[in-house]
């Protein structure tokens, strides 16, 4: 306590001195989030320590001046010496090789909810990159709403993903004008590669995404991918939109966007299968159901599930579009995504008499090449533990008709659409490598930013898997 008192006396003597931060970036020690360091920050830090303030991996970053992941008297000492003219330890900053998205929440409030949006200002600095259109400025920012998103990454990772809703439609980094986007924080290799495979095989819609560096409330947050939010829209999942609470039996047959995923959600129902397993179903559009809508979608998925488990082509083909299923399946086999038929499994349906569900779009390749015993390549449904046991897939692959459609799409896809994938991957890695290094400085020890080793390892795994798949599907049978 005596040391703390001495430091406070020293700080009072320096009360007229301040240090400015870079435009858009807070300097280390900016406890009060006013983009400068002065006596007020020292006072706030002292008060915080006396009241037992705890370190937070993101929001304490400018306050943890010596980067020891603690808020303590050492930080006060460094601040005071900085006001005397000594240099502070540098904070990680953006690489300057990608556009920078600045987001400042209202009142600089923390983003700590996946349910409640908070208001924020934003602007996009093109960083002089050719072909990139800047949006907004620090003096005239644009508006948005922002909240958390994700499951494992939100709950377990210090670096958080976000969902954003712009005040007005914008074309972000060349993507179609829209208000709804996600900021994906991880998987710099597997998500872009999985999405590119989806585009190449010809699924009707694949979310567009672009890399960007993010500064949140003046703190460098790292490398993110701005990604289109999956939603019903003429430029996204292009089905006729169904109104919330619709009761007309003709109108409730289509406009559906649903997801098979076990993470708990308020818009979710469960189907008990004959073997005692539970099939979890989320409904995204419409997202507020009348009794008629709930009865319709529940019965449709129940009938689909029952038909698949009976392993009768003539029955389950009534409910499943074979072409989209085959393309979706091939993409996930190529990247060996062991979670692909367990979570983030999107389905959609057009309006009309047809009862067929279409597979896609793809989303979340976080478990790509997640199998540890990979020395002998195998199919997704083989050698899988109970945690990743896929819904439906083991039954579907028993169908000769389905295998025939898979082989047809494989021969269209390989080798012509696959042969330049490694060039695409190398170009992607080259584009984001310096930003990935900056991200690694910001979030040391995290797996997703080790791009060089990831790239060679994943390409090796993909070559082996493609060779295996072509041996199974490439010849006429």
Regions found by a protein language model. Give the residues of each.
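Positively charged n-region of N-terminal signal peptides that target proteins for export
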Residues: 1-6
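Conserved NTP-binding catalytic cores of kinases and kinase-like/nucleotidyltransferase enzymes
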Residues: 91-193
